[in-house]
């Protein structure tokens, strides 16, 4: 299972670190994903959910 939010689709994105000399190195920015159990078709299923989805009430936990 990929680390992608089941509800919002948030996933890891890439960017750059910049030094004072403006040198660049690649970096990744990861979302705050939590593993939660939800009901899908009446059965419990463990999925990744972003903290934003949890706080906004998009997730109905069991």
From Swiss-Prot:
Cellular component GO terms, alphabetical:
ribonucleoprotein complex; ribosome
HAMAP family linked to this entry: Ribosomal_bL28
Annotated Gene Ontology MF terms? structural constituent of ribosome
NCBIfam families for this protein: L28
Similarity comment: Belongs to the bacterial ribosomal protein bL28 family.
Any one Gene Ontology BP term: translation
Origin, by domain of life? Answer: Bacteria
> Do you know which Pfam families this protein is assigned to?
Ribosomal_L28
Q: Which organism is it from?
A: Streptococcus pyogenes serotype M1
The protein's name is: Large ribosomal subunit protein bL28
- Key words, A-Z: Ribonucleoprotein, Ribosomal protein
